[in-house]
Amino acid sequence: MAVPKKKTSKSRRDMRRSHHALKGSAYGECPNCGELKRPHHVCGSCGHYDGREVVQNASA
């Protein structure tokens, strides 16, 4: 079984884990209705994506 030759210092351990943090979700404004929506997703409020209506009656 593989065993480390040297002890990993707290500094090196923490530097390795520096990329493990959760990142916040990115949101943008829908150009059609102005509601917040995820990038590259259909707007949940009006059903528009890329300048055209994709979903009929999204909120109604």
Curated annotation (Swiss-Prot):
One of its GO terms (biological process) is translation. GO terms for cellular component: large ribosomal subunit. The keyword Transmembrane does not apply. One of its GO terms (molecular function) is structural constituent of ribosome. Residues 1-22 have a biased composition (Basic residues). Keywords: Ribonucleoprotein, Ribosomal protein. It holds the Pfam family Ribosomal_L32p. InterPro entries: Ribosomal_bL32 (IPR002677), Ribosomal_bL32_bact (IPR044957), Ribosomal_zn-bd (IPR011332). Residues 1-27 are annotated as: Disordered. The keyword Ribonucleoprotein applies. Belongs to the bacterial ribosomal protein bL32 family. This is Large ribosomal subunit protein bL32.
